[in-house]
């Protein structure tokens, strides 16, 4: 009996494989597509197809990423796999692939390694809510006690970084065995996907969050008033809704939406993802400028001080050729505009080299609307020298 064709009615989640180099992330990705394609849920992708990751540009940074999609009985997944460690760091920090959950791959032969730890920490910093563990290469370890020890070590590490190490699923298997259709290991791949289905939660969709639209442009329509255009980032906006306009150092403005224009038609509502023009009552064109945001009243506040997890580009990536020191003052490109900010380095860090990834303190010269998870590029003279996201608002 043929399985039904792909349908969009299943909930969609973004996940990815993370973990130390050579622990089997790409092999596992290939095994998942193989086992699920045998069940009729997707097309299988070979190791080489996944490993040969195309280059992508995200916020001015080149990243190699492979995208694979597959379905389980309950969900549709978009899965990212990166060939190199630097690609993972860049991917997670820039949010090129926003992950709703991750599969942490740890080889039973090695146990947790430095990049295992680093990826868990990054996941915590960039807000990956939950992780499922796949202990790989279990077929190469014949000591049950050793397997138990490795599992305990992984659970402790997850707990250390504030994940639920005690209750999170750990599946012991062999990615290569699953890929090669070995009857001992195929069920473990199925078990892993069931664990993803049950443990990784569906994210709150953008349309369910409060309304927010960054302003890209402003103009006047004679007889109608002021229109601000942009792409609605989150939420839904209806005609008649009260809104606030904040950011760029200006006093908070309040207004009412008198219409929403899309494709040269006036509509009653706009939602996340729409490019729209919002007609605002009683607001002069001079009062709004690019870089401000229009929001549901009270949902976001402007802030100027925050902590952030950042990746600084290497020279070969078009970044700086030299390190920078404390009190470095680049521009922070947030949503639609540049704001100058001052970077304070962590205690004990003298300078930051191109290619580094670290946590910094930033003070912007003018406050902008922000919440934890907000992404930005760091620019200098119009070129991107780094990227990051807000991990904590300090003032």
Curated annotation (Swiss-Prot):
CDD domains: EF_Tu, EFTU_II, EFTU_III
Chain intervals for the UniProt region annotation (G1): 19-26
Binding site for GTP: 19-26, 81-85, 136-139
SUPFAM superfamilies: EF-Tu/eEF-1alpha/eIF2-gamma C-terminal domain, P-loop containing nucleoside triphosphate hydrolases, Translation proteins
InterPro entries: EF-Tu_GTP-bd, EF-Tu_GTPase, EFTu-like_2, EFTU_2, G_TR_CS, P-loop_NTPase, Small_GTP-bd, T_Tr_GTP-bd_dom
Gene3D superfamilies in the cross-refs: P-loop containing nucleotide triphosphate hydrolases, Translation factors
Sequence ranges assigned to domain tr-type G in this UniProt record: 10-204
Stretches the record annotates as G4: 136-139
Ranges for region G3: 81-84
Region feature G2, mapped onto this chain: 60-64
List of residues binding Mg(2+): 26
Primary location recorded for the protein, binned into one broad class: cytoplasm
Enzymatic reactions: GTP + H2O = GDP + phosphate + H(+)
Subcellular compartments: Cytoplasm
One GO location term (cellular component): cytosol
Keywords: Cytoplasm, Elongation factor, GTP-binding, Hydrolase, Magnesium, Metal-binding, Nucleotide-binding, Protein biosynthesis
Annotated region described as G5, given as residue ranges: 174-176
UniProt GO molecular function: GTP binding; GTPase activity; translation elongation factor activity
EC top class named in words: hydrolase
Enzyme Commission numbers on file: 3.6.5.3
Chain's role: GTP hydrolase that promotes the GTP-dependent binding of aminoacyl-tRNA to the A-site of ribosomes during protein biosynthesis.
Subunit structure: Monomer.
Protein name (Swiss-Prot/TrEMBL): Elongation factor Tu
Organism of derivation: Flavobacterium psychrophilum (strain ATCC 49511 / DSM 21280 / CIP 103535 / JIP02/86)
């Amino acid at each position: 009996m043929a399985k039904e064709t792909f349908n969009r009615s299943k909930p969609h989640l973004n996940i990815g494989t993370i973990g130390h180099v050579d622990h089997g992330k790409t092999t596992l990705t290939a095994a998942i597509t193989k086992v699920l394609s045998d069940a009729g849920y997707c097309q299988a992708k070979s190791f080489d197809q996944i490993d040969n990751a195309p280059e992508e540009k995200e916020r001015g940074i080149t990243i190699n990423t492979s995208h694979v999609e597959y379905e389980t009985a309950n969900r549709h997944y978009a899965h990212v796999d990166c060939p190199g460690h630097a690609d993972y760091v860049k991917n997670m920090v820039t949010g090129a692939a926003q992950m709703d959950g991750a599969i942490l791959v740890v080889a039973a032969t090695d146990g947790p390694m430095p990049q295992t730890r680093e990826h868990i920490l990054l996941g915590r910093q960039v807000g990956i809510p939950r992780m499922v563990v796949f202990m790989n290469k279990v077929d190469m370890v014949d000591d049950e006690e050793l397997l138990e020890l490795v599992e305990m070590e992984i659970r402790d590490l997850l707990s250390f970084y504030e994940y639920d190490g005690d209750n999170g699923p750990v599946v012991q298997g062999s990615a290569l065995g699953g890929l090669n259709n070995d009857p001992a290991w195929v069920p473990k791949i199925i078990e892993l996907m069931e664990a993803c289905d049950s443990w990784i939660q569906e994210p709150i969709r953008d349309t369910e969050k409060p309304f927010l639209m960054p302003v890209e442009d402003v103009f006047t329509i004679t007889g109608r008033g002021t229109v601000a255009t942009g792409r609605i980032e989150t939420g839904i906006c209806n005609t008649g809704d009260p809104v606030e306009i904040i950011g760029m150092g200006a006093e908070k403005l309040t207004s009412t939406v008198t219409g929403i224009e899309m494709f040269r038609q006036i509509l009653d509502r706009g939602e996340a993802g729409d490019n729209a023009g919002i007609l605002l009552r009683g607001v002069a064109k001079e009062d709004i400028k690019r870089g401000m945001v229009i929001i549901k009243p009270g949902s976001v506040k402007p802030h100027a001080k925050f902590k952030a997890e950042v990746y600084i580009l290497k020279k070969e990536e078009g970044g700086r050729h030299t390190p920078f020191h404390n009190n470095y003052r680049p521009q922070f490109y947030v949503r639609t505009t540049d704001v100058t900010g001052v970077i304070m380095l962590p205690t004990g860090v003298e300078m930051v080299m191109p290619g580094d990834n670290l946590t910094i303190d930033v003070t912007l010269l003018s406050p902008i609307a922000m919440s934890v998870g907000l992404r930005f590029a760091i620019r200098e003279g119009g070129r991107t020298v780094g990227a990051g996201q807000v991990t904590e608002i300090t003032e």
